[in-house]
Structure formats: structure tokens, C-alpha cells
């Protein structure tokens, strides 16, 4: 029996390696796609870079959710947010609006700008805040203490308004410097296009951006690629991230792996 189990494991590994190898050679998928296949709840995130989107066509490609860029800093609105928000809302996708965090603006002002721009979120996914380096910030990272303070103000203001902790999207470098140990009770959406976060962030992530060079049908912008993501839980657990009409939400983080 033990030898049979070992043989089965070896064969499974060989099949997986073969599939991944074919995908690499044909450039249809990257290695991460093999591992992301273990999480069937799949989604995209988009901004004006994808240009005009045919949401009916896009949503029909085995997708469950979409995060749409709404705001950046304390005064910028994505030029395609209103159109994307309206049209995506006519599909069966779970949709959410994300904010691109600025290291150069007041966190409270950024939250207020998001609230004014996006409005009520009844039936939609809770807010997401994208925290990543931009410009020369990676080479010269913003002060840790001040960044944590401003990000806290932004997140707390959003939670106060919408009744639910926002999702934090981030990269590994930013996670290690600002997020880890400070915002552990917030849902984590981690970017890792190289390997599964299950290897070093097991039990800490809920969303995983596993690819940034995917090509789907249904959009025609300056950017030919689109980001692909998976949710760590089931579709029913994803539904727990929706804002209900009363604004009252469960305190726990569903779908944690």
C-alpha cells in the first residue's frame, strides 16, 4: 500500500510538471497558473489601462469577481471608474472598488476621497486599498512610522464608514516593511507572480494576484495584459466579503488559508 501511494504521488508530480512545462513552452500560462488552479474562485483587477471593457464578454471567461480602480491619493479618480463600475454591476460578478494609496497624502483625506467618489457599497465587496511602491519609492522607501500612521487613518476611516475592514493589497517588499505585524487583522491580498504565497504566508492571505501578464478577451486599452487573482475560499465564503444593506458585518476574516 505504501509503495502504491509513493508511486501515485510521483505520477501526480510528473503530470503536474508536464502540464506546467507545456504551458511554459507554449507561453499560455506561467508556472503560478498551475498552483492557482487549486483555487477555483477567480477574478481580475482593472483600471483605465485596460481601456474600454466589454464586461459581458470579460465576465464570461470563468471569472467570479473583479476589483476596479476607483481612486488614487486624495484627489484623483480613475478616468474609467464610473463606466466600469456601472457596466460591471450589470454582470454576475462580485465587484469591488479599490483605492491606490499615496505615501504623499493624508490617510484620512484619501479615505474621504474614496467615500465621496465610490459612495455606498451595498451588495458590493468591501473596499480594497492598494499599498505598493511607485516612482522612486522602492529605492527610497517612505518613513515606516509615518506610513503606518497614515495607512491606519485611511483604513480606520473606511472601516468606520462601511462597517467592514478593508482588504489590503500589497507586494512582498511593502508587506515586510509596513504591513506585517501592524495590520494582521485585515484581509490580505498579496501580489506574487513568482510562486504561491502558501509557501511563506500560509494562513495569512485571502486573495492572491498570481499573474500580471494574462490576456483575456473583452478589453482594448493601451495595456494588452490583465491581472489575474484567486480567492482562497469558496464562492460562498467570498460572498461574506460583500457589504450588506445594514452595514453590519462579521468581524472574522472568511476564507483564510
Where are these regions (language model features)?
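Sec/Tat-exported extracytoplasmic proteins
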Residues: 62, 70, 89-92, 118, ...
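Substrate-binding cleft of extracellular glycoside hydrolase catalytic domains
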Residues: 31, 36-53, 68-153, 159-161
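Glycine-enriched alpha-helix->loop->beta-strand junction motifs that scaffold or abut catalytic
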Residues: 62-65, 92-93, 123, 182-189, ...
Amino acid at each position: 500500500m505504501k509503495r502504491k501511494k509513493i508511486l501515485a504521488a510521483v505520477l501526480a508530480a510528473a503530470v503536474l510538471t508536464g502540464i506546467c512545462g507545456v504551458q511554459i513552452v507554449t507561453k499560455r500560462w506561467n508556472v503560478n497558473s498551475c498552483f492557482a488552479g487549486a483555487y477555483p474562485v477567480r477574478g481580475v483587477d482593472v483600471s483605465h489601462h485596460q481601456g474600454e471593457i466589454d464586461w459581458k464578454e470579460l465576465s464570461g471567461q470563468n471569472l467570479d469577481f473583479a476589483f476596479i480602480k476607483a481612486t488614487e491619493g486624495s484627489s484623483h479618480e480613475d478616468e474609467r471608474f464610473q463606466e466600469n463600475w456601472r457596466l460591471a454591476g450589470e454582470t454576475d460578478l462580485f465587484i469591488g472598488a479599490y483605492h491606490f494609496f499615496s505615501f504623499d497624502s493624508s490617510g484620512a483625506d484619501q479615505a474621504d476621497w474614496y467615500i465621496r467618489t465610490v459612495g455606498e457599497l451595498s451588495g458590493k465587496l468591501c473596499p480594497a486599498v492598494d499599498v505598493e511602491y511607485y516612482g522612486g519609492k522602492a529605492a527610497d522607501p517612505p518613513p515606516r512610522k509615518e506610513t503606518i500612521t497614515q495607512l491606519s487613518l485611511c483604513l480606520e476611516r473606511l472601516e468606520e464608514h462601511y462597517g467592514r475592514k478593508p482588504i489590503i493589497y500589497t507586494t512582498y517588499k511593502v508587506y515586510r516593511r509596513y504591513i506585517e505585524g501592524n495590520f494582521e487583522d485585515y484581509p490580505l491580498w498579496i501580489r506574487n507572480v513568482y510562486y504561491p504565497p502558501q509557501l511563506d504566508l500560509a494562513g495569512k492571505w485571502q486573495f492572491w494576484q498570481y499573474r500580471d501578464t494574462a490576456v483575456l478577451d473583452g478589453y482594448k486599452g493601451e495595456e494588452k495584459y490583465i491581472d489575474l487573482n484567486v480567492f482562497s475560499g469558496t464562492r460562498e465564503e467570498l460572498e461574506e466579503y460583500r457589504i450588506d444593506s445594514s452595514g453590519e458585518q462579521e468581524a472574522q476574516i472568511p476564507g483564510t488559508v
